[in-house]
Amino acid sequence: MVWLEQPDDFAKPWKLRRIGTHDPDALTGLNFADIDGDGDQDIITGGYSQAPRDHDGDEVTRDGHLGRLAWFANPGDPTAAWTRHDISRRKRGMFDKFLPRDMDGDGDVDFVSTRGNSAPYDGVFWLEQVRTAEPVASFERAREVDSVEMPLPTRER
């Protein structure tokens, strides 16, 4: 994922700025919001799984294309590296639409999102942001049963 910086002089080429990657997972959707509350635009992203749509089989392993949710923290400096924060990675699902809203009125941005291609788990879901002094990996699912949670790949490409 990259962004293009428009130069002040229209005769000059645009600058290509790297943000990050979901590799090996396919990036299918994104949206912008100030996720960390520092005043700049961060990016939430979703990925698309190539696993079967109707079961959590062994066809796709941790190094295959899986459904991933992550967000990238904007460093504030266009030349600095963005930091990826993984939220969830599942055997089944396509996470592609993200609406930033403060759903619980606590002053931070949450996301209403959609999930598809993972019957019977398709639908609309809410990613609630809970702020802590230090980052804490936390994902509370709303269902008792869901597609298998998968670890990150053995190596990122």
Where are the regions that the model predicts?
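Beta-propeller-forming repeat regions
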Residues: M1-R157
